[in-house]
């Protein structure tokens, strides 16, 4: 199979160990990812962000292929049991292709909106391990043990730590791929870094215990700027894209819409166009895998369009605002006002303004808190190797990353219907909550 890709150029998956990727791509479960946008409603802020989870899955498999080539170029010094054999490579390619298989509509939004809905990681494992799925059968056609091995890799578990971390770790194929693709689609420059040189800089860190497989490390003489650029790119993408005000506002509104619909369904209301999976989730009932796989962006869009004609005026209003991109406005809190106590005071002020206007404060005003740790302080950190001396943790070698390690990037915003914003800001200033 040969494909043209705007991020990676010519992408190919040949016979042998790579043949599992085209097999998986042809399954209904992977094809479903064509109907789920990678960045949800980020296109409300960045019009080009219409790329799909499917494109990311193919790209992740391509990055894994490049990583496998590099690992094989340097694994000759390892004992055979620690080397990347053909069956292990096939498992890794499959895991890279399938790692996001369980995502629901608009990526993370669905699982966050309705309490009790399993997260996408759990759905991914269910799809891989369920004997009735085409994905499971495709894996089974290669090897009877392949579904279990691929599921373990998706969980970040493998006898070879370097392979587990390639699927789920600080420097994994998922992050390597989505940064480049998201930057390309949104038109920003922050997510670009030198993937080719970063892969070229990979080494194995020697371990004293010969029974343990070595960890993957960065060549300190060549790769330090490349890994710094990679981690800083992730930081900048969170600052400028993933936590963008318009995106977060749209996400908040959709969560509010889904929560309102779930509440009405729980109270016995029948909402036209609602997928069966949403009805079950609203009642707190388990969602069968088949019903979950019917969910995609189109199903949710159709449902929300139908909800514009519902009897509940609040649901109608929210659904209409989302479709028309009439986004809620935000007011960002800083310093003491962003602390847990400060944000609650600010929210209370905003709620009082909403009540004064006869609006439901549980719907038309809210607190949006988004956070991430771009450079995690890990117990098992990424290592850097030099010609002399033992491997050292990356954050000990890079003064830039040492300053960032463990730091939480957070945005705390009051979200509200547009007509309330000026009055809310005045009320916050008058109360001292916006000082």
Enumerate the predicted regions with their spans.
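Histidine-centered, transition-metal-coordinating active-site segments
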Residues: 1-93, 101, 105-435
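Aromatic-lined, polymer-binding surfaces characteristic
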Residues: 98
């Amino acid at each position: 199979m040969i494909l043209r890709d705007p991020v990676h150029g010519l992408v190919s998956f040949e016979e042998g160990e790579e043949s599992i990727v085209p097999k998986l791509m042809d399954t209904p479960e992977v094809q479903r990812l064509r109907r789920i946008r990678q960045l949800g409603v980020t296109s409300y802020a960045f019009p080009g962000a219409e790329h799909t989870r499917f494109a990311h899955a193919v790209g992740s498999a391509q990055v894994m292929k490049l990583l496998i080539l590099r690992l094989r170029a340097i694994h000759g010094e390892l004992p055979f049991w620690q080397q990347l054999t053909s069956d292990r490579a096939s498992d890794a390619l499959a895991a890279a292709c399938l790692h996001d298989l369980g995502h629901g509509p608009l990526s993370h939004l669905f699982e966050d909106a309705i309490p009790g809905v399993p997260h996408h990681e759990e759905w991914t494992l269910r799809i891989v391990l369920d004997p009735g799925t085409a994905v499971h059968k495709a894996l089974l056609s290669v090897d009877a043990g392949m579904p279990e091995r691929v599921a373990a890799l998706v969980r970040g578990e493998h006898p070879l730590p370097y392979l587990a971390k390639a699927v789920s770790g600080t420097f994994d194929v998922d992050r390597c791929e989505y940064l480049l693709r998201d930057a390309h689609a949104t038109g920003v420059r922050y997510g670009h870094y030198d993937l080719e040189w970063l892969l070229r800089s990979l080494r194995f860190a020697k371990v004293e215990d010969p029974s343990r497989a070595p960890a993957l490390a960065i060549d300190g003489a060549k790769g330090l700027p490349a890994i710094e650029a990679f981690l800083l790119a992730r930081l900048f993408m969170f600052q400028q894209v993933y936590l963008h005000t318009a995106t977060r506002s749209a996400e908040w509104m959709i969560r509010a819409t889904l929560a309102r619909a779930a509440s009405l369904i729980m109270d016995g209301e029948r909402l036209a166009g609602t997928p069966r999976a949403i009805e079950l989730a609203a009642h707190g009932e388990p969602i069968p895998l088949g019903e979950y796989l019917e969910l995609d962006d189109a199903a949710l869009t159709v449902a929300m369009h139908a909800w514009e004609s519902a009897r509940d005026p609040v649901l109608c209003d929210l659904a209409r605002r989302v479709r028309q991109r009439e986004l809620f406005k935000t007011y960002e809190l800083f310093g003491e006002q962003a602390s847990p106590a400060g944000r609650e005071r600010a929210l209370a002020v905003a709620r009082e303004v909403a009540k004064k206007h006869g609006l439901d404060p549980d719907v038309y005003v809210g607190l949006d808190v988004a956070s991430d740790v771009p450079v995690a302080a890990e117990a098992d950190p990424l290592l850097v190797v030099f010609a002399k001396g033992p491997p050292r943790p990356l954050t000990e070698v890079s003064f830039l990353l040492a300053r960032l390690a463990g730091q939480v990037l957070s945005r705390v915003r009051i979200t509200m219907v547009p007509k309330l914003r000026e009055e809310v800001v005045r009320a916050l200033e008058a109360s001292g909550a916006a000082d």
